[in-house]
């Protein structure tokens, strides 16, 4: 027996008419037979299932195409004009920079302004001054021939290179400078960077990556610290210029490699020729022997020793009689003794060419101005010819200051007797760090008032790995006379006595 429901019959009839209508409309569209055939084969002519899915399709289209309804924000609070003004008046913005410390205020207050870079010049107010704070160790910044060559190049090539060396920044002047540096030191190749500071901070990460090992002097300069930080390498520090501690660390690493059968990695020892923070000299002979024994490569930063050490200024390799090829990577500065600009890295051809595509500072920085490149290779030419006499003069004047300093009861120095950078530190270690800074700054000001410019070694203490005792930094140059050096040594002693008496500081040593 079959039952009939008129309502459902009407709905079903209406549905069939609708489907027939849309079916005819669908026939007009290209590819509709394929769709209809797919529907029939998929749902086996089940109209109810097709109807339900059609409703879902209509609902989805409605949901996507409908206009979004904005709901009222329950957290919105409407303020009156008076309340807004009160909130604005009460608001205290945070300062963009932290308030200056007492030390920073003292530093900003006591910055001298000079008329020129010469060793004998004037302050901006016209008072004569002898500059013992300049890194112009060989007095080449005042060399007339170098100045004339630099000016002529400036007129020919313009001020800047206006592009990185790898694109269009390299000029024939740069190529000659690289060739002259390599020839002067006695290595295969050299590469020139636009800034001295960024040279070693770029060279280290170019060769050392995550998983490699760096054994570094704990008192290394800030540029080295930045380089090893960028490299993300495993780092071990040895005590400053302590070869026994260095050998202990190398042996520990070797034992660890053997014990755990670790894979072979790149391993470097990093140190300075003359320490920027202490002025003392590393034992290159011993460190080369250790790096050969334990199969390490050596990165030697000669920023302060190139142009100041050795018979003709070739650096520590010449000073100790070590073949320059025994040092894999030699870093040097062109801004000190050579009176130019930038820095360089010298060594094997393979090592140098690797940096042209991997040295970040070489790739992304504009090339060294051509005029500074010319000044540097003209200075190298002078060193090649007259370096022997110039270096003898520099060493004798450094030794003279050391001799006069030995009579000073307030200061001691860790600087090597042949180093032109001399750090003077208080013998009394009980004086607090900040008080030492204030005392040294006052001594500097008193010396400037007497016509001698010296400087306190300044560092960003919060960024330094090791806190170094404050010091006066004296820079000796061949342009200084023996009388000036003797007078400065006596003046520092006199002014220190005045400052100690003024602040009632009792020298405990």
From Swiss-Prot:
Pfam families: Aminotran_1_2
One Gene Ontology MF term: pyridoxal phosphate binding
GO biological process per UniProt: ceramide biosynthetic process; sphingosine biosynthetic process
Cofactor(s) named in the record: pyridoxal 5'-phosphate
Assembly: Lcb1 and lcb2 encode essential subunits of the enzyme and form a heterodimer.
Protein name: Serine palmitoyltransferase 1
EC number: 2.3.1.50
Protein family: Belongs to the class-II pyridoxal-phosphate-dependent aminotransferase family.
Disulphides: none
Segments crossing the lipid bilayer: 45-65, 327-347, 363-383
UniProt-annotated location(s): Cytoplasm; Endoplasmic reticulum; Membrane
